[in-house]
Amino acid sequence: MTWLEYHELTKHSAESLRRTQHYLDWANIPNPFRHYEGVRVVDLPVDPPAPQISALEVLGGKTGNTLARDGAEFLSQLMFYSASISASKRVPSSGAIYSLRVNPSSGNLHPTEFHFCTRGLVDWSDGLYHYRPSSHTAEQRAIGDFGTKLINNSAPLIFVLTSIAWREAWKYRDRAYRYCLHDIGHAWQALTLAARSLGSESFAMGHFLDDRVAESCLLSADEWPMLIVGLHGPSIPLNKLNADETVVFGGQPNRLSEEQKTYPLIESIHTATKLSTESTIPSLGEPKASGRGEITLPSHVSASRSFGDVVRTRRSALDFKGGRESISFPQLATLLSATGERLFADFATHRYVHLYL
Protein backbone atom coordinates (compact mmCIF):
# COMPACT_ATOMS: atom_id res chain seq x y z
CA MET A 1 0.00 0.00 0.00
CA THR A 2 1.32 3.42 -0.98
CA TRP A 3 0.01 6.91 -0.28
CA LEU A 4 -1.06 7.30 -3.89
CA GLU A 5 -2.94 4.00 -3.84
CA TYR A 6 -4.74 4.96 -0.64
CA HIS A 7 -5.60 8.36 -2.09
CA GLU A 8 -7.04 6.84 -5.25
CA LEU A 9 -9.05 4.25 -3.33
CA THR A 10 -10.56 6.73 -0.87
CA LYS A 11 -11.03 9.92 -2.86
CA HIS A 12 -14.53 11.26 -3.41
CA SER A 13 -16.21 10.94 -6.78
CA ALA A 14 -19.75 11.09 -8.08
CA GLU A 15 -19.66 7.33 -8.49
CA SER A 16 -18.38 6.62 -4.97
CA LEU A 17 -21.06 8.83 -3.44
CA ARG A 18 -23.75 7.13 -5.53
CA ARG A 19 -22.65 3.63 -4.50
CA THR A 20 -22.42 4.23 -0.78
CA GLN A 21 -25.10 2.76 1.45
CA HIS A 22 -23.41 3.71 4.68
CA TYR A 23 -25.52 4.93 7.59
CA LEU A 24 -24.49 6.18 11.01
CA ASP A 25 -25.02 3.57 13.71
CA TRP A 26 -25.82 5.90 16.58
CA ALA A 27 -26.17 3.01 19.02
CA ASN A 28 -22.53 2.12 18.39
CA ILE A 29 -20.97 5.59 18.27
CA PRO A 30 -17.50 5.49 19.88
CA ASN A 31 -16.96 7.09 23.26
CA PRO A 32 -15.07 10.36 22.58
CA PHE A 33 -13.24 10.08 25.90
CA ARG A 34 -10.57 7.51 26.72
CA HIS A 35 -9.71 6.81 30.33
CA TYR A 36 -7.73 4.19 32.21
CA GLU A 37 -9.07 2.09 35.05
CA GLY A 38 -6.88 1.37 38.05
CA VAL A 39 -4.54 4.36 37.88
CA ARG A 40 -4.09 7.44 40.03
CA VAL A 41 -6.02 10.47 38.75
CA VAL A 42 -4.32 13.81 39.47
CA ASP A 43 -6.57 16.87 39.68
CA LEU A 44 -5.45 19.94 37.76
CA PRO A 45 -6.31 23.37 39.21
CA VAL A 46 -9.70 24.56 37.99
CA ASP A 47 -10.26 27.84 36.15
CA PRO A 48 -6.60 28.53 35.33
CA PRO A 49 -5.82 32.16 34.44
CA ALA A 50 -6.14 33.03 30.77
CA PRO A 51 -3.08 34.04 28.72
CA GLN A 52 -3.45 37.77 28.10
CA ILE A 53 -1.25 38.02 25.02
CA SER A 54 -3.31 38.70 21.90
CA ALA A 55 -4.19 35.82 19.60
CA LEU A 56 -2.64 37.55 16.60
CA GLU A 57 0.64 38.06 18.46
CA VAL A 58 0.78 34.35 19.28
CA LEU A 59 0.04 33.46 15.65
CA GLY A 60 2.80 35.83 14.63
CA GLY A 61 5.38 33.99 16.75
CA LYS A 62 5.48 36.15 19.89
CA THR A 63 5.60 34.38 23.26
CA GLY A 64 3.55 35.28 26.32
CA ASN A 65 4.19 34.42 29.95
CA THR A 66 2.71 32.51 32.85
CA LEU A 67 2.59 32.98 36.61
CA ALA A 68 2.42 29.22 37.21
CA ARG A 69 4.39 28.28 40.31
CA ASP A 70 4.45 24.51 39.90
CA GLY A 71 3.86 21.71 37.44
CA ALA A 72 0.15 21.33 38.18
CA GLU A 73 -0.59 25.01 37.53
CA PHE A 74 1.40 25.03 34.30
CA LEU A 75 -0.16 21.82 33.00
CA SER A 76 -3.62 23.07 33.91
CA GLN A 77 -3.13 26.25 31.89
CA LEU A 78 -1.54 24.40 28.98
CA MET A 79 -4.27 21.77 28.64
CA PHE A 80 -7.17 24.10 29.43
CA TYR A 81 -6.22 26.32 26.49
CA SER A 82 -5.30 23.54 24.06
CA ALA A 83 -7.38 20.39 24.57
CA SER A 84 -10.10 20.82 27.20
CA ILE A 85 -13.88 20.96 26.92
CA SER A 86 -14.98 24.48 26.05
CA ALA A 87 -18.78 24.11 25.89
CA SER A 88 -21.67 21.67 25.82
CA LYS A 89 -24.59 21.59 23.40
CA ARG A 90 -27.90 19.77 23.28
CA VAL A 91 -29.37 18.05 20.21
CA PRO A 92 -32.91 19.51 19.83
CA SER A 93 -34.43 16.34 18.35
CA SER A 94 -33.15 13.89 20.97
CA GLY A 95 -32.07 15.99 23.93
CA ALA A 96 -28.65 14.33 23.88
CA ILE A 97 -25.77 16.46 25.16
CA TYR A 98 -22.39 16.58 23.45
CA SER A 99 -19.17 18.43 24.20
CA LEU A 100 -17.10 20.89 22.22
CA ARG A 101 -13.37 21.23 22.77
CA VAL A 102 -10.73 23.87 22.35
CA ASN A 103 -8.94 21.89 19.63
CA PRO A 104 -11.03 21.48 16.45
CA SER A 105 -11.98 18.04 15.14
CA SER A 106 -13.64 16.88 11.95
CA GLY A 107 -17.15 15.73 12.77
CA ASN A 108 -16.41 16.52 16.44
CA LEU A 109 -15.24 12.89 16.74
CA HIS A 110 -11.83 13.63 18.31
CA PRO A 111 -9.59 10.68 17.41
CA THR A 112 -6.57 12.37 19.06
CA GLU A 113 -5.40 11.54 22.59
CA PHE A 114 -2.82 13.54 24.57
CA HIS A 115 -0.20 11.51 26.46
CA PHE A 116 2.74 13.29 28.06
CA CYS A 117 6.00 12.62 29.91
CA THR A 118 7.19 15.02 32.60
CA ARG A 119 10.75 15.55 33.83
CA GLY A 120 11.72 17.86 36.68
CA LEU A 121 8.49 19.87 37.07
CA VAL A 122 8.06 21.55 40.46
CA ASP A 123 5.91 19.48 42.86
CA TRP A 124 4.98 17.04 40.09
CA SER A 125 6.21 13.44 39.86
CA ASP A 126 8.25 12.53 36.80
CA GLY A 127 6.38 9.99 34.74
CA LEU A 128 3.94 9.11 31.98
CA TYR A 129 0.46 10.66 32.03
CA HIS A 130 -2.70 10.77 29.95
CA TYR A 131 -4.86 13.88 29.80
CA ARG A 132 -8.54 13.27 30.52
CA PRO A 133 -10.47 16.23 29.03
CA SER A 134 -13.83 15.05 30.41
CA SER A 135 -12.70 16.00 33.93
CA HIS A 136 -9.60 18.17 33.25
CA THR A 137 -7.37 15.70 35.09
CA ALA A 138 -4.18 13.74 34.41
CA GLU A 139 -4.03 9.96 34.71
CA GLN A 140 -0.69 8.78 36.07
CA ARG A 141 0.26 5.66 34.12
CA ALA A 142 3.88 5.35 35.23
CA ILE A 143 6.54 6.99 37.42
CA GLY A 144 10.09 7.72 36.28
CA ASP A 145 12.02 9.43 33.50
CA PHE A 146 10.11 8.24 30.44
CA GLY A 147 10.96 11.15 28.17
CA THR A 148 14.64 10.35 27.68
CA LYS A 149 13.85 6.66 27.29
CA LEU A 150 11.18 7.43 24.74
CA ILE A 151 13.10 9.53 22.21
CA ASN A 152 16.39 10.37 23.98
CA ASN A 153 15.25 13.95 24.46
CA SER A 154 15.89 16.06 27.56
CA ALA A 155 12.83 18.33 27.21
CA PRO A 156 10.99 18.67 30.55
CA LEU A 157 7.64 18.05 28.89
CA ILE A 158 7.12 15.66 25.97
CA PHE A 159 3.72 14.99 24.42
CA VAL A 160 2.84 11.93 22.38
CA LEU A 161 -0.22 12.64 20.25
CA THR A 162 -2.02 9.47 19.23
CA SER A 163 -4.96 8.57 17.01
CA ILE A 164 -7.81 6.14 17.59
CA ALA A 165 -8.88 5.54 13.99
CA TRP A 166 -12.13 3.83 14.94
CA ARG A 167 -13.60 7.11 16.15
CA GLU A 168 -13.29 8.51 12.62
CA ALA A 169 -14.00 5.23 10.81
CA TRP A 170 -17.41 5.04 12.51
CA LYS A 171 -18.46 7.89 10.21
CA TYR A 172 -15.89 8.10 7.43
CA ARG A 173 -14.97 4.39 7.08
CA ASP A 174 -11.91 3.84 4.84
CA ARG A 175 -11.37 7.59 4.51
CA ALA A 176 -10.82 7.86 8.28
CA TYR A 177 -7.01 7.94 8.10
CA ARG A 178 -7.23 11.23 6.22
CA TYR A 179 -9.19 12.72 9.10
CA CYS A 180 -6.84 11.29 11.73
CA LEU A 181 -3.94 13.15 10.12
CA HIS A 182 -6.08 16.27 9.76
CA ASP A 183 -6.94 16.20 13.46
CA ILE A 184 -3.35 15.54 14.54
CA GLY A 185 -2.42 18.77 12.79
CA HIS A 186 -5.15 20.63 14.66
CA ALA A 187 -4.05 19.13 18.00
CA TRP A 188 -0.38 19.89 17.33
CA GLN A 189 -1.00 23.53 16.57
CA ALA A 190 -3.48 23.92 19.46
CA LEU A 191 -0.78 22.61 21.81
CA THR A 192 1.99 24.66 20.18
CA LEU A 193 0.07 27.94 20.31
CA ALA A 194 -1.09 27.39 23.90
CA ALA A 195 2.51 26.69 24.94
CA ARG A 196 3.69 29.82 23.13
CA SER A 197 1.06 31.93 24.87
CA LEU A 198 2.57 30.72 28.16
CA GLY A 199 6.15 31.53 27.19
CA SER A 200 7.26 28.10 25.97
CA GLU A 201 8.38 26.87 22.58
CA SER A 202 7.94 23.47 20.99
CA PHE A 203 9.52 21.11 18.51
CA ALA A 204 7.54 18.37 16.77
CA MET A 205 8.92 15.00 15.73
CA GLY A 206 7.23 12.77 13.18
CA HIS A 207 10.35 10.68 12.61
CA PHE A 208 10.37 7.94 15.24
CA LEU A 209 10.04 4.18 15.56
CA ASP A 210 6.30 3.72 15.88
CA ASP A 211 6.21 0.34 17.60
CA ARG A 212 8.86 1.35 20.14
CA VAL A 213 6.95 4.51 21.06
CA ALA A 214 3.64 2.63 21.28
CA GLU A 215 5.20 0.07 23.61
CA SER A 216 6.90 2.73 25.75
CA CYS A 217 3.61 4.65 26.13
CA LEU A 218 1.69 1.48 27.00
CA LEU A 219 -0.76 2.06 24.15
CA SER A 220 -3.50 -0.42 23.29
CA ALA A 221 -3.70 -1.91 19.80
CA ASP A 222 -6.44 0.49 18.68
CA GLU A 223 -4.33 3.59 19.41
CA TRP A 224 -1.40 4.70 17.27
CA PRO A 225 1.37 7.24 18.00
CA MET A 226 1.32 9.93 15.30
CA LEU A 227 3.39 12.88 16.53
CA ILE A 228 5.77 13.72 19.38
CA VAL A 229 5.97 17.31 20.63
CA GLY A 230 8.64 18.49 23.07
CA LEU A 231 8.15 21.69 25.09
CA HIS A 232 10.94 23.81 26.54
CA GLY A 233 11.50 27.31 27.85
CA PRO A 234 12.09 29.30 31.04
CA SER A 235 8.37 29.62 31.77
CA ILE A 236 8.06 25.92 32.67
CA PRO A 237 8.49 25.70 36.48
CA LEU A 238 11.39 23.29 37.06
CA ASN A 239 13.47 22.09 39.97
CA LYS A 240 16.43 19.75 40.18
CA LEU A 241 15.83 16.40 38.55
CA ASN A 242 14.68 13.43 40.56
CA ALA A 243 16.17 9.97 40.20
CA ASP A 244 12.98 8.04 40.85
CA GLU A 245 12.84 4.37 40.00
CA THR A 246 10.57 3.55 37.09
CA VAL A 247 7.24 2.14 38.24
CA VAL A 248 4.60 1.16 35.67
CA PHE A 249 0.90 1.23 36.56
CA GLY A 250 -0.47 0.91 33.04
CA GLY A 251 -4.19 0.88 33.63
CA GLN A 252 -6.95 -0.71 31.59
CA PRO A 253 -8.28 1.43 28.71
CA ASN A 254 -12.04 1.78 28.58
CA ARG A 255 -14.07 0.15 25.83
CA LEU A 256 -15.15 2.75 23.28
CA SER A 257 -17.97 0.85 21.53
CA GLU A 258 -19.98 -2.33 21.89
CA GLU A 259 -18.64 -3.34 18.48
CA GLN A 260 -15.36 -1.88 17.25
CA LYS A 261 -15.02 -2.59 13.54
CA THR A 262 -11.71 -2.90 11.73
CA TYR A 263 -10.89 -1.51 8.31
CA PRO A 264 -8.03 -3.36 6.56
CA LEU A 265 -7.36 -0.42 4.24
CA ILE A 266 -6.74 1.88 7.22
CA GLU A 267 -4.50 -0.73 8.85
CA SER A 268 -2.54 -1.07 5.60
CA ILE A 269 -1.91 2.63 5.07
CA HIS A 270 -0.89 3.12 8.69
CA THR A 271 1.58 0.24 8.39
CA ALA A 272 2.96 1.87 5.25
CA THR A 273 3.65 5.11 7.14
CA LYS A 274 5.41 3.49 10.10
CA LEU A 275 9.16 3.56 10.59
CA SER A 276 10.73 0.31 11.72
CA THR A 277 14.41 1.23 11.30
CA GLU A 278 16.58 4.29 11.93
CA SER A 279 16.11 5.60 8.41
CA THR A 280 16.14 9.22 7.33
CA ILE A 281 13.32 11.40 6.06
CA PRO A 282 13.30 11.41 2.25
CA SER A 283 14.30 14.69 0.71
CA LEU A 284 11.80 16.47 -1.50
CA GLY A 285 12.70 19.09 -4.06
CA GLU A 286 11.14 22.51 -4.17
CA PRO A 287 8.07 22.79 -6.42
CA LYS A 288 8.14 25.08 -9.40
CA ALA A 289 6.62 28.51 -8.95
CA SER A 290 3.14 29.00 -10.35
CA GLY A 291 0.81 31.91 -10.88
CA ARG A 292 0.74 34.85 -13.24
CA GLY A 293 1.50 37.77 -10.99
CA GLU A 294 1.99 39.06 -7.49
CA ILE A 295 -0.29 41.13 -5.29
CA THR A 296 1.11 43.32 -2.54
CA LEU A 297 -0.77 42.61 0.67
CA PRO A 298 -1.85 45.53 2.89
CA SER A 299 -0.57 46.17 6.39
CA HIS A 300 -1.66 43.79 9.12
CA VAL A 301 -4.46 44.59 11.50
CA SER A 302 -3.25 45.17 15.05
CA ALA A 303 -6.31 45.00 17.31
CA SER A 304 -7.00 41.49 18.58
CA ARG A 305 -8.79 39.65 21.35
CA SER A 306 -6.68 37.80 23.89
CA PHE A 307 -5.49 34.31 23.05
CA GLY A 308 -7.34 32.77 25.99
CA ASP A 309 -10.62 34.38 24.97
CA VAL A 310 -10.29 33.31 21.34
CA VAL A 311 -9.51 29.64 21.91
CA ARG A 312 -12.18 29.16 24.58
CA THR A 313 -14.91 30.63 22.38
CA ARG A 314 -13.80 29.11 19.05
CA ARG A 315 -16.54 27.28 17.16
CA SER A 316 -16.75 25.55 13.79
CA ALA A 317 -18.19 27.55 10.91
CA LEU A 318 -21.40 25.99 9.61
CA ASP A 319 -22.11 28.68 7.03
CA PHE A 320 -20.70 31.93 5.70
CA LYS A 321 -22.73 35.12 5.95
CA GLY A 322 -20.80 37.31 3.52
CA GLY A 323 -21.80 40.86 2.71
CA ARG A 324 -20.97 43.44 5.35
CA GLU A 325 -19.85 40.74 7.78
CA SER A 326 -17.11 39.46 5.46
CA ILE A 327 -13.51 39.87 6.62
CA SER A 328 -11.56 42.77 5.18
CA PHE A 329 -8.53 42.50 2.92
CA PRO A 330 -6.18 43.60 5.75
CA GLN A 331 -7.69 40.91 7.99
CA LEU A 332 -7.12 38.31 5.27
CA ALA A 333 -3.54 39.54 4.88
CA THR A 334 -2.97 39.08 8.61
CA LEU A 335 -4.24 35.50 8.48
CA LEU A 336 -2.11 34.71 5.44
CA SER A 337 0.95 36.10 7.21
CA ALA A 338 0.34 33.77 10.15
CA THR A 339 0.18 30.74 7.83
CA GLY A 340 3.70 31.53 6.65
CA GLU A 341 5.26 31.27 10.11
CA ARG A 342 8.03 28.71 10.39
CA LEU A 343 7.08 25.26 11.64
CA PHE A 344 9.50 23.83 14.20
CA ALA A 345 9.52 20.14 13.33
CA ASP A 346 11.85 17.45 12.02
CA PHE A 347 9.74 17.23 8.86
CA ALA A 348 9.77 20.98 8.17
CA THR A 349 13.22 21.28 6.59
CA HIS A 350 11.56 21.31 3.18
CA ARG A 351 8.36 22.93 2.05
CA TYR A 352 5.95 20.00 2.09
CA VAL A 353 2.77 22.08 2.19
CA HIS A 354 1.87 25.02 -0.01
CA LEU A 355 -1.13 27.29 0.28
CA TYR A 356 -3.13 28.25 -2.80
CA LEU A 357 -6.14 30.57 -2.88
Label each region the model flagged.
Residues 1-357:
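N-terminal accessory segments that position/regulate proteins before the catalytic core
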